[in-house]
Amino acid sequence: IAEPVRAYQVLTKPGDAAHRVISAKRQFASRRTAIAALFAGLLIVIAGVGLAWWQPWFERVAPADPARMAYALPDKPSIAVLPFDNLSADKEQEYFSDGVTEDIITDLSKISGLFVVARNSTFIYKGQPVNIRQVAEELGVRYVLEGSVRRAEEKIRITAQLIDATTGGHIWAERYDRELKDVFTVQADVARQVAKALAVTLKANENERLFQKYTANIDAYDVFLQARRTVVGGSRDNILRGEKLFSRVIELDPKFAGGYAGLSFNLSVQVRLQYSDSPSADVLRAFDLAKQAVVIDRDFAWGHIALGGAYLANGDADGAVDAVRQALALEPGGYEANLFMGFYLQFAGEPALAVEHLQLARRLSPVETVRDLAFMAWAQFMNRNYTETVRLLTDMSRKFPHSKIASLMACRAAAYALLERPEEAAVVVKKLLDAHPKFNLSQWEFGKLWKLEENRTRLYNAAKKAGIPEFPVGE
């Protein structure tokens, strides 16, 4: 060979050359395919990251401005749960979707690391076009949870999505297709996933309580949801309807604490508002029922609140406070636990502390109800802030003109009397006696519930000064 030839390997057989050329082509093609696959995978990852940020499957909302919020954002992650839409074919299932929403709010309230707005304030947006920015600014929260419920026979589909109102972005979403009997597990998982998305660590007992089943009887739960709606409205007809429904819950599942707690709470309210025909017997029943609820499930906060109501109806304000303290331990961010703690404390002779709890309840539920205004009015009266008492009860009569609760009308008249405004007191007394002709101080059981004699006497004398009769008219 005149010139040297570079060779990697000498092939001695004629067929080897063709074989090696084909093999080399295959190896090259394989490498090219691998590179292409790697490049395609990289593009998918980049696209995925971009999509996760852009979220084209969600409609981004206009961000809320913390400076325009009605309340300063709390130190904890704050959240409002909007009423879940009822997408069931049967529109009568509205109570069920409302119940799912309420239970998710309750479960979230069990998590001490969250600030959760109460049902009373979020349900004012029910049936309205949702404006996340408006909700966040009016309620003073950073996060909003919304979703839907579809129920078909023994199946449910629940969707939920969590929005950061300050950015307008969605930070978590999920769809659950489950058996109806698994509704409690779904509700608990929504609460847990929300906490996880907000980087809130659950305490061991909080995680355990989230996944407790209140009842395995879905029919009992169904009736309980209907019965619970009667608690919100304070009319006599509504309360009497609630009594029947809670009794039905107990029949369907004697091991469900909710039926006993609800019926106990209902009877205590009847006694307190003087709707009861047998107050002494109803107080005893309320006690027994609440105690059964607590024995069945010590972690059911409403059972302790109901027990507090029974204590108060029996004139034991200290017992009422002790009972609700247990509810607060179970639901530290619970609106009702703080509300009733405030209500019972002023009966126990601690109106200043009562006002603090009621202010927290107000922050948890910025949209006021008759109950919110009434409880704060009583606390301010016992705190000797009569001007604020009058303002609250005047505001209540303006917002809720059909609410003519005798005790509250008497409280307003008494406050006017202590402010030396006899003409205005007389106007309120006339309205009181027009609505409740038999009302008199000697039979005013509610006026006897205060622990301190000084408070009972102050209220009684002020009501008498306002012109409320001491004894039934004509006697």
Question: Which residue ranges define each predicted feature?
Answer:
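Cytosolic regulatory/linker segments at or just downstream of nucleotide-handling modules
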Residues: 1-23
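Short, flexible loop/turn segments with low-complexity composition
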Residues: 22, 206-211, 472-475
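Short, Lys/Arg-rich N-terminal segment immediately upstream of the first membrane anchor
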Residues: 24-31
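Acidic, proline/glycine-rich low-complexity intrinsically disordered segments
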Residues: 31-404, 408-419, 424
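Acidic, Ser/Thr-rich low-complexity linear motifs
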Residues: 210-213, 276, 437-451
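TPR/TPR-like (Sel1-like) alpha-helical repeat modules
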Residues: 417-439
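Terminal, low-structured helical/coil segments at or just beyond the last alpha-helical repeat
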Residues: 441-475
